[in-house]
Regions:
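N-terminal hydrophobic/helix-forming segments and targeting peptides
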Residues: 1-467
Length: 467
C-alpha cells in the first residue's frame, strides 16, 4: 500500500510551476551577460538581411567553412556553406551518420520589418527633399515617425557595377526622419484610428533642404541631394530604379534596465534566434547527424521569393548532398528534424488584456516552445506531434536548458505564423521555438539576456544530439 501524501507533497509532485531561468541557475546571469556582448555587436553591424549575410559569411570563413561544391562527396566533420542571392545563409557540418538517417536543421530568419524605398523615391516639396517609402512586413506605421533613421542599401549602376552604402550609423553621419504633426494642430489627426495615425503615403523620409547655388534650376533641393549622392557614390536618379534601399532605425543595441538584464534593439525579430543558431552551428564538432543552419529571408512577408523558405534552395542543398553521396533524399527528409527558430510575443503586464496569462510566454523564463502557431483556429499552423515535443523537451531537460511552452496572445485577437509549415510540407518533422520579445515589430524591441543565452544552449545541444 502506497504511503499517503499530504496536499503540499502532492502539489510538489504533480503541479507544474514555470520558473525564471536566472533565478533557478546561479551562473546563468553571468554567462548570459557575456554572451550578449557578442550579440549586440552583431546587431549593430547587421541592420539588413544583406548585411547579416555578409557578417555571417565572415564568421563562417573565420571558422574554417568552405564554399559548397554540389558534386563533392564530403567527409564527416567537414564544414560547408553557401549564400543564396546575397540575402540568405546556409551552413552545415557533415555528420558521422549517413544523410539517409536524417539532418538536424535550425532555421531562423534575418529579414526584419522596415521601410523600403519605392522604385522612384526621390521628390521635392516646398523646398525640402524626401524619399517615398513602402513599408515591409507588419509595421505599426505610427512608430516610425520622429525617430532617427539610417539608410542602408545597394545601387546597381548603369555599367553593371554595384555600390553598397549605409548612412546614419556612424556618430558623425547625418540621420533622417519622418515628421509628424505638433499636438497644437493635431485635432483632425487625433480623430483617426490608431492604425491610420500615420498612413502609408505619409511615411516620407526627410533627407534635405539645401539648394544648388545656380538660379533658375527646377527642383533645386532635389538636384542638390542628387549631386551629393553622385559625388559620393557615382549614382544618378535612374539608378534608384535598380536599387534595394532600406530605411531602418539608427539606434544601436543597448542594455535595458538598471540591472542591465535586457537588450533593446531594432531587429531582434529574428536575429535574436539567428545569431545563436549560427554560433551553435559554427561551434559544432563531429556531430552524429549532419547539421544545417539556415538564416533565411522574406519571412516577414510570407517567405515568398527566391530567398524565402517557400523557395527550394535549402531542400536542393540537402538533395545535392544526398545525390553526391549516392543516398536517398526522400529517406533523408523523412528522418530529419528541424527547429523553426522564430520569436514570439513576451507577456507584457502593461498590455495584459492582449494575452492569456496561463499560456503566455515570459521574458526571462528561457526559450519558448510552441507546439503550434497560426491564428484563431490554428489557421496556417504546423502542429508538431506530441512525440516530437517530448523528444525536444527531454533533450533540454537532460542538458539543464530552461524552456517554457505556450501560445501567442488571446485566441481571437490575432496570431502569427512561421516557416515551419514550409519545412513540414517536405516531410520533415519540425517544432517552433524562439525568444520572447517585448514590443515586437517595433523600431526598438526588447529581449531578456537569459532567453538569448538559452536559445544558444538549445541550438547547441540540438546540433550535438544523437537522436
Amino acid at each position: 500500500m502506497s504511503e499517503k501524501l499530504t496536499a503540499k507533497e502532492y502539489a510538489e509532485k504533480l503541479l507544474y510551476t514555470p520558473e525564471y531561468a536566472a533565478d533557478k541557475q546561479a551562473d546563468v546571469k553571468e554567462k548570459a551577460a557575456a554572451f550578449a556582448e557578442g550579440y549586440k555587436k552583431f546587431m549593430d553591424s547587421a541592420k539588413t538581411e544583406r548585411e547579416a549575410a555578409v557578417v555571417s559569411e565572415q564568421m563562417l570563413l573565420a571558422a574554417g567553412y568552405k564554399a559548397f561544391e554540389p558534386k563533392k562527396v564530403y567527409a564527416p566533420g567537414e564544414k560547408v556553406y553557401f549564400i543564396q542571392e546575397n540575402k540568405a545563409v546556409v551552413a552545415a557540418t557533415i555528420g558521422q551518420k549517413p544523410y539517409e538517417e536524417g539532418f538536424r536543421l535550425v532555421i531562423a530568419h534575418i529579414d526584419c520589418p522596415r521601410l523600403d524605398l519605392r522604385p522612384n523615391p526621390l521628390y521635392e516639396s516646398d523646398h525640402m527633399s524626401y524619399f517615398r517609402t513602402h513599408y515591409y512586413g507588419g509595421v505599426r506605421k505610427y512608430q516610425w515617425a520622429t525617430i532617427p533613421l539610417a539608410i542602408h542599401g545597394v545601387f546597381t549602376r548603369a555599367d553593371g557595377s554595384s555600390v553598397n552604402f549605409a548612412i546614419g550609423e556612424d556618430e558623425n553621419d547625418p540621420v533622417f526622419c519622418i515628421t509628424d504633426l505638433l499636438p497644437h494642430l493635431g485635432a483632425e489627426q487625433n480623430e483617426r484610428k490608431l492604425s491610420e495615425g500615420i498612413k502609408g503615403e505619409e511615411l516620407n523620409v526627410l533627407i534635405g533642404s539645401d539648394t544648388v547655388e545656380e538660379e533658375d534650376v527646377k527642383e533645386a533641393v532635389k538636384l542638390n541631394t542628387l549631386i551629393l549622392l553622385n559625388q559620393k557614390y557615382g549614382i544618378t536618379e535612374r539608378d534608384f530604379t535598380r536599387a534595394e534601399i532600406e530605411v531602418v532605425p539608427a539606434a544601436k543595441a543597448r542594455d535595458v534596465g538598471f540591472d542591465r538584464s535586457m537588450i533593446g534593439a531594432y531587429g531582434h525579430d529574428d536575429r535574436v534566434d539567428a545569431y545563436p543558431a549560427l554560433l551553435a552551428e559554427i561551434e559544432t564538432k563531429d556531430p552524429v547527424h549532419t547539421t544545417i543552419c539556415v538564416l533565411t529571408d522574406k519571412e516577414e512577408i510570407g517567405s515568398d521569393g527566391v530567398t524565402g523558405m517557400q523557395s527550394m534552395y535549402v531542400f536542393h542543398f540537402m538533395q545535392l548532398l544526398c545525390h553526391a553521396a549516392g543516398q536517398d533524399d526522400i529517406l533523408a527528409f523523412r528522418n530529419s528534424v528541424c527547429l523553426s527558430a522564430d520569436v514570439t510575443a513576451a507577456y507584457d503586464p502593461s498590455w495584459a488584456s492582449a494575452f492569456e496569462k496561463q499560456n503566455g510566454t515570459y521574458a526571462g523564463r528561457g526559450i519558448a516552445i510552441f507546439k503550434y502557431t497560426g491564428s484563431r483556429g490554428k489557421s496556417s499552423a504546423s502542429d508538431a506531434n506530441a512525440e516530437l515535443v517530448g523528444d525536444i523537451t527531454r533533450m533540454l531537460d537532460a542538458n539543464n536548458v530552461a524552456w517554457q511552452i505556450g501560445e501567442m496572445g488571446r485566441l481571437d485577437l490575432g496570431g502569427g505564423g512561421t516557416i515551419a509549415k514550409y519545412v513540414a510540407n517536405r516531410g520533415i518533422k519540425v517544432l517552433d521555438l524562439g525568444v520572447p520579445v517585448l514590443s515586437m515589430h517595433s523600431p526598438f524591441e526588447v529581449i531578456h539576456k537569459t532567453d538569448l543565452y538559452m536559445a544558444y544552449r538549445t541550438f547547441s545541444v540540438f546540433c550535438q544530439s544523437a537522436d
